[in-house]
Every structure is written in structure tokens, then in C-alpha cells.
Amino acid sequence: MTRHRELFHDLDAMTRLFGRWNGSLLQLSRGQLAAEAGVAQGTKLRCFQVQANQHVRTLGGADGTTCTLIPVTGPLGECYWQQRRVAAGEVILRGCDIPYDASIEPDAKVTALLVSEHRLREAHRSLMGREIAHSLSGWHSLRAAPIRVPRLLARAGEFLAASASTAVGAAVCEDACLRELVACIADGPAEIWPLASRAALVKTALEFLHSTLNRPVSSLEICQAVRANDRTLRLAFQERFDVGPVAYQRILRMHAVRKALKSRKTRSVREAAMIFGFTRLGSFAAEYRIHFGEQPSETLGSRPSGG
């Protein structure tokens, strides 16, 4: 078993904690990031626990094998999961065939347990004496018994705290987590989440915004691209991200500049800013500092020597 917990002030550094995870984190709110993240890796499952002081969007690809289960507490009920809100006391189940998409409010603590679909089905068969009654594809909201979420969180906490030096104790904690996951699935029923029209509109708009990161876009241009009126589009983005589509694209562009500044592909703040359509460098630098809590020149200076 391996276990690690660390404090972070940079989302890219926190992403690396998750190892081979094919995903990205996007800070939507303004200010210096302060986050704590922990991970425990056993022989049967992985457990992540993350809490940050900023509004963060989490995106991850489907790997075709791993399911993710997340118990929902009060604060997490205010967050968006696959463009839906979920009630406290439910358990989110993401199938291995669908990308991860969550918009997490500031200070909400996320505890996620990841296990292969094969292992989950095998454990359910062993513990319950029957196959899982429903599909594990897509996103589901599991309406488990009221005791399930606190018990699952308690077992996950024990697994995260288990010492790597006591292999037997860690294995017991891991099996206890797996047993609680099976109990949540067995409680059922599972509600499959279809993509509502407003969520589908956001998805289409995001595809357009990601394709235009080299320049700013106007509300008119976005409305024409997605064939929706301005009010509907703004409401959909405000509901999901707390900002409108134009502001959201600007955040995307700032993150793109930040990524460029950390890489060896740009030599100056000016060059990176211009690539992504920021032509007023003074205004850009001020906005960048407000959003990330540091000057763009500090980001540039923090990359490894030789960049």
C-alpha cells in the first residue's frame, strides 16, 4: 500500500499527485489556491480526498476499466456532477465508459474511491451472492440507506490514514471500503442521469470556447455558434460555473497562458499572453495576479532552470 498527503498552492502540482490520471483541474474563482489532497493506493482500490479554497472544475477521461464512487455530504450537494446537482446522502457512481466532469465549490471536501468494474462486480458477487442488478455504464445517483454515506466516509478515512508499514491493517481497511461500496450499490435503486437540454447547450458552447483560445470572443459570436439566445446561454453558464460564457473563456485563456509560462515553449510573459489573445499586458498582468495570487512573471520564474 502507498499513502501520501500534501498541501498545494498550484493545481498542476496537485494533478501530478494522482499519478497516471488522465485529467485536468481548472480554477474558476479568484485568489491564491490553498488545497489539501491525500491519496491511498491499495491492491484493490484507490482513494482520493481533496479540499480546496477555490471553485475548481475537474475533468478526466474515461479509461474503460475504472469506476468512481463519491459519497455526497451537505456541501457537495451544492456542486455540479456531470452538470447535475445531487442530494446529500446519495452516492455518485461514474461508470468506466464516461469522462469525469465535476464543478466543486470552495471548501467542499471530495472523497472518491476508484475500483475496476471487474473487481466491483466480483466483490458484489462474493458478498451478496448475486450479480449487480443494473448497468455500471454512465453516471448514476445511488440512493443508498441513510447510514451508508457516513459509514463509507469513515471507512475511507481509515484507509487514507492506514500506515503503509502495517500491511495487514491496511488490507483490512481496504476490504472494509470495498464492502461499503458493494452495500451502497446493493441498496439501489440507481437513477441514470440523462443530459438535459441546458446541460447539452453548455457542452456545445464549451467545445466552441476551447476551439477559440487564441483570441477573445463576444457573446454574439458564441450565440451564433451554438444557436442559442444570450439570456439562455448566460443562465446556463451562471448555473454551472458562476460566470458567463465570455468570462469563462477568458479564464480558460488565462489558464492556457499559465500552462505556457510553466513550459519551455515561451520565453516571456508577453509572448505567452499574445499567443492567447491578451494584447493589453498591464491589464492582463493585474487580472492574472487577482486570479492566481501571483504575477505572471513569478510563474515564468518558477519553471525549472533551462526553460
Question: Residue spans of the language-model regions?
Answer:
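Conserved glycine-rich phosphate/nucleotide-binding loop
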Residues: 274, 286, 292
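Short hydrophobic/aromatic patch on the recognition helix
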Residues: 233, 237, 283-284, 288
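Generic protein-terminus/edge-of-domain signal
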Residues: 1-76
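Alpha-helical bundle regulatory/interaction domains
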Residues: 1-30, 78-213, 218-220, 224-230, ...
